[in-house]
Amino acid sequence: MILQRLFRFSVIRSAVSVYLRRNIGVTAVAFNKELDPIQKLFVDKIREYKSKRQTSGGPVDAGPEYQQELEKELFKLKQMFGNADMNTFPAFKFEDPKFEVIEKPQA
């Protein structure tokens, strides 16, 4: 009943129909179980990478050189920015400028 009243307005009807058409098109592709072999391999690799990343808790297949380089770069950043926490946004404090009042000589 409420939907019928809403669909009387052409603007709402057209917006909803476009939205539904777009979503139905996306879900039809997403739920298509018939994947070609290349696409299936790609999706399998993405899932494998995701599971590896979750188990390792960081970068996948990163050797000790990568960890050393990462620590070195983070150390450089901490030195450049005064040992600030890199995960938080810096707090800025702006002071209002102080203006001097200059009196105009009267002519």
Curated annotation (Swiss-Prot):
N6-acetyllysine PTM sites in chain numbering: K40, K45, K78, K93, K98, K104
Pfam family, one: ATP-synt_F6
Known function: Subunit F6, of the mitochondrial membrane ATP synthase complex (F(1)F(0) ATP synthase or Complex V) that produces ATP from ADP in the presence of a proton gradient across the membrane which is generated by electron transport complexes of the respiratory chain. ATP synthase complex consist of a soluble F(1) head domain - the catalytic core - and a membrane F(1) domain - the membrane proton channel. These two domains are linked by a central stalk rotating inside the F(1) region and a stationary peripheral stalk.
An MF annotation (GO) of this entry: proton transmembrane transporter activity
UniProt superkingdom: Eukaryota
Protein name per Swiss-Prot or TrEMBL: ATP synthase peripheral stalk subunit F6, mitochondrial
Organism: Pongo abelii (Sumatran orangutan)
One GO-annotated biological process of the protein: proton motive force-driven ATP synthesis
Subcellular location: Mitochondrion; Mitochondrion inner membrane
Lineage: Eukaryota, Metazoa, Chordata, Craniata, Vertebrata
Subunit architecture: Component of the ATP synthase complex composed at least of ATP5F1A/subunit alpha, ATP5F1B/subunit beta, ATP5MC1/subunit c (homooctomer), MT-ATP6/subunit a, MT-ATP8/subunit 8, ATP5ME/subunit e, ATP5MF/subunit f, ATP5MG/subunit g, ATP5MK/subunit k, ATP5MJ/subunit j, ATP5F1C/subunit gamma, ATP5F1D/subunit delta, ATP5F1E/subunit epsilon, ATP5PF/subunit F6, ATP5PB/subunit b, ATP5PD/subunit d, ATP5PO/subunit OSCP.
